[in-house]
Design a protein with these regions (language model features):
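Intrinsically disordered, low-complexity acidic/proline-rich regions
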Residues: 1-16, 31
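Repeat-blade elements of multi-bladed beta-propeller folds
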Residues: 2, 21, 25, 29-64, ...
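Aromatic (tryptophan-biased) beta-strands that constitute blades/sheets of beta-rich domains
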Residues: 2-3, 16-25, 38-103, 110-111, ...
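Inter-blade boundary loops/turns of WD-repeat beta-propellers
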Residues: 117, 160, 199, 253-255, ...
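Beta-propeller blade signature
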Residues: 155-159, 247-256
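Asp-box/WD-like beta-propeller blade repeats and closely related beta-sheet repeat scaffolds
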Residues: 164-195, 202-226
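C-terminal, beta-strand-rich globular interaction domains
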Residues: 213, 218-219, 225-231, 251, ...
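Surface-exposed beta-loop interaction hotspot
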Residues: 216-218, 311-313, 319
Length: 443
C-alpha cells in the first residue's frame, strides 16, 4: 500500500520553532516556580511570629494633684510586673522604658512585645528566628533591628498601637549597634557606620565608612571610628576617634543628599580618653565628656561652657569605664519639662535646654528621672524621690514595695545598670536590668 508523501515529510521550520518555544516556555515556568519557592523559603517574613490588635489601648488620666508642685503622693501601689529577655548591655538598652500609645514596648531576645499599661497583658508581639540587636521608638513607630546575613542591619517598623507592619530596611551593620533617635528621626550606629531614617525607614543620612561606596570622598572622616552619637530636631552630633584623636562633628540630620553629610563644625577634642562620649545635645549645641570634664559647643564651633566633674558634688567616676571596647558609648539621657539630663554611675546632671549649661546635680540618683505633672520622680537608693519640677527641691521619698525590691535584687551588684523611670498618666514604670514594675501613684 502506497503511503502518502506527507507521512514521511520532515517537520517544517515553523513546527520545529514552535516545539522549541514550548520547551523553552516550560523551562522558564519551572525556573520561575523554583525562584519563587526559594524566595519564600529564604524569606525573613516566613520566619516571623507576629500578632496584631485592633482593640484600643485606652487613654491615660492624670490626677489634678500632679499639677500641684507641693502635693506629695502617699504611696506607690503595685499593679503588674513583666520581664525582658533581651540582653542588657549598656549601649543597647533604652535610657527609659519605651512607652508609646499607652503601651510598654518590651525587648525580647528575638523580638518585641507590647504590654497594656492598664493591666500588664500582652497587646501584640513580633518575633523572628534571629536575635534582636536594638530597639527604639520615634515619629510614631517602633523600630526593631535584628541580626541578618550582613550583621545587625535588618530593621522593621511597626505601629505601636496595633503591631501592624509598616516597612523593612536592610543595611550592612556590625553585630553590636546602638539606637539613636529624636522626635524627628531614628537610626542605628556602630563603630564604623551610622544611618538615620524617616518613619517609613527611608534613609535620610549615612555617615562613616560606607561599604563599597562609589563616592568615598563625600564622607568627612571615613578613616575614623564612631565613639558616640546623639540627635535632636535637625542636628546630628557625632564624636569620632581619628587615630587616637577625638573630633566632634556637628551636622544637619537631614541633608539634601543622604550620602553627603552637611557638616556645620568639625571640632578637635584632643586625645581620646576612656570616658570620651557625648552626654547631651540641643537644637544647636552638644556637650562632650572627656577626661572627667564636660565641654559644651555651639554648632558654629564656639565653646560655651566647661565643667570639671571633680569640682561638683557628683560621685567619683568608676574605676572601669567603657570596658566593652569598640561598642558604642550610648549615654543615658532623658528630657524633663525644663531640663535635659544625663545619668552615669557618678549621679545625675541637668542641663538648660538653650545653652546646655549645667544647672543641677544629684549624686544620690541611681538612674534616669521622669516627669509627672509639676513633679519629677528620681530613683534613689531607698525608693523614688519626688521633686518640685520648678525649684528642683526634694519634697519627699516614696519607698518601693518589697516585691519590686526583690525583683531588682539580682542587679544590685551592677551599678552601671541604672534604674529607669517613665510615667504615663498616674502609672509609674520602674525598670532595672530585665525587670519592669508598674505602680499606681496614689494621692
Amino acid at each position: 500500500m502506497l503511503q502518502s508523501p506527507q507521512a514521511n515529510a520532515e517537520p517544517t521550520t515553523a513546527e520545529t520553532r514552535l516545539r522549541r518555544n514550548r520547551i523553552a516556555s516550560v523551562i522558564l515556568i519551572i525556573a520561575v516556580v523554583l525562584v519563587i519557592g526559594w524566595t519564600w523559603v529564604a524569606s525573613p517574613a516566613r520566619k516571623v511570629d507576629r500578632t496584631e490588635t485592633t482593640a484600643s489601648a485606652g487613654s491615660a488620666m492624670q490626677a489634678p494633684a500632679a499639677n500641684d508642685p507641693e502635693a506629695m503622693p502617699h504611696t506607690l501601689q503595685p499593679v503588674w510586673s513583666t520581664e525582658s529577655s533581651a540582653s542588657t548591655s549598656t549601649h543597647t538598652i533604652s535610657p527609659a522604658p519605651l512607652v508609646m500609645d499607652n503601651s510598654l514596648i518590651v525587648a525580647e531576645d528575638r523580638g518585641v512585645r507590647a504590654i497594656s499599661l492598664n493591666d500588664g497583658t500582652e497587646r501584640w508581639h513580633y518575633r523572628r528566628d534571629t536575635p534582636l540587636c536594638a530597639l527604639s521608638g520615634s515619629v510614631g513607630q517602633v523600630f526593631a533591628t535584628f541580626r541578618g546575613e550582613a550583621g545587625c542591619g535588618e530593621t522593621v517598623a511597626l505601629k505601636p498601637d496595633s503591631g501592624q507592619y509598616v516597612a523593612t530596611r536592610k543595611s550592612i551593620a556590625a553585630d553590636s549597634p546602638a539606637a539613636v533617635r529624636s522626635n524627628s528621626y531614628a537610626g542605628v550606629y556602630d563603630s564604623g557606620f551610622l544611618e538615620l531614617w524617616r518613619s517609613d525607614l527611608v534613609r535620610v543620612l549615612e555617615y562613616g565608612k560606607i561599604p563599597a561606596s562609589p563616592e568615598p570622598k563625600m564622607q568627612p572622616h571615613p578613616e575614623c571610628s564612631i565613639i558616640s552619637a546623639l540627635t535632636r530636631v535637625e542636628l546630628l552630633a557625632v564624636v569620632n576617634n581619628c587615630d587616637g584623636h577625638g573630633r566632634l562633628v556637628m551636622q544637619v540630620a537631614n541633608p539634601e543628599e543622604s550620602r553627603k553629610p552637611e557638616v556645620k563644625s568639625d571640632i578637635d577634642l584632643g586625645p581620646v580618653t576612656a570616658d570620651m562620649s557625648l552626654v547631651s545635645v540641643g537644637q544647636d549645641t552638644a556637650a562632650v565628656l572627656a577626661d572627667n570634664r564636660i565641654r559644651v559647643f555651639r554648632m558654629d564651633g564656639t565653646m560655651l561652657t566647661e565643667l570639671a566633674l571633680g569640682e561638683t558634688t557628683l560621685r567619683p567616676a568608676p574605676a572601669e569605664a567603657n570596658s566593652d571596647g569598640d561598642a558604642p558609648r550610648a549615654p543615658f539621657t532623658t528630657d524633663l519639662p525644663h531640663h535635659m539630663t544625663w545619668w552615669s554611675p557618678r549621679g545625675l546632671l541637668g542641663f538648660r535646654p538653650s545653652t546646655l549649661a549645667p544647672d543641677f546635680e544629684f549624686p544620690e540618683a541611681t538612674g534616669t528621672p521622669a516627669p509627672w505633672g509639676e513633679h519629677v520622680f528620681m530613683p534613689v537608693a531607698d525608693g523614688v524621690a519626688v521633686l518640685n519640677a520648678s525649684t528642683l527641691e526634694i519634697i519627699g521619698t516614696l519607698p518601693l514595695p518589697a516585691a519590686a525590691k526583690s525583683t531588682h535584687a539580682n542587679d544590685a551588684d551592677k551599678p552601671e545598670l541604672p534604674v529607669r523611670l517613665a510615667v504615663v498618666g498616674d502609672t509609674l514604670l520602674v525598670q532595672r536590668g530585665e525587670s519592669v514594675d508598674a505602680f499606681v501613684i496614689e494621692i
